[in-house]
Amino acid sequence: MNELTSLKAAAVQFQHQASNKKYNLLIMEKFIEQAALEQVNILTFPEMCITGYWHVPKLTAAQVSALAEPIVDSPSLTLLRSLAIKHQMLIGAGLIERADDGRLYNAYVACMPDGSMHTHRKLHAFEHPAISSGDNFTVFDTPWGVKVGILICWDNNLVENARATALLGADILLAPHQTGGTDSRSPHGMKPVPLALWEERETRREEITAAFKGPSGREWLMRWLPARAHDNGVFLLFSNGVGADDDEVRTGNAMILDPYGRIVNETWAAEDAMVSAELDLSLLAMSTGRRWIHGRRPDLYQILTQPQGYERDAISARFSNVPPSR
């Protein structure tokens, strides 16, 4: 294993087309070629970017199944695997997986330079009743001497998931999303970005930039995302959709954070974009979060694994208007 002192990473935001895998893969190929020119080692695309995202809740179970692909024989992943081998790059991408037992998952696959693949199944899937939630954390070795973990979108909002991924050894967290501009049930959470604003973005540049940087976009991310990197001493690669996604507008904000929660590179452009950065791996060892983790007292934390009686399934927790009871 060739251990490096730094490596190049990149995060992509792009507007996918619903169920149009051919189009989405063409866009992804262009970014992969751009990343190869920049000698990127790790490239991350958004959640469900191959299949499309927010139209899925409106599909029938049969339509969702038809959109899904088995991981091993996936035509989409066959293409990405070949490009990962060609460019000696880790390429992460999201799709709907059809497992051997027929169950469906919101999955994110890391295609490795040697042709192998690592698959994470979203732990808190709420996109469709036909899509099951995964039951395992995902952390794996890379050719560059660092371990990579994956958490998909809402997985990152529950702090336990990020901590568990760090405890399993992750140095870099891939955090693919489809977020921003959602109609949060929380009074001071995200709110919709008008579709008309996106459609008129060329003539309303200041307004669309303000929306993407505001409380339904970047401001919302800044309330919690840097803490996932800082508190766990990991680099974090945030990739996201951008633009109209059915009846919502994704706010992009692709960014890369270091183990201190500092933003190394980001964009708030209202367009398809890629941000890249050199990750200084020497920052990991003495980062604040890693030092704090060594002060843990696991004997006190049994409460974290004990059901409290008010837990809900992901769909209910995400969409219910009934206030949580405690």
Residue spans for each PLM region:
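CN hydrolase (nitrilase-like) catalytic-core segments centered on the catalytic cysteine
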Residues: 72-92, 147, 156-274
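Beta-strand-turn-beta hairpins that frame and shape the catalytic cleft
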Residues: 2-9, 139-149, 170-172
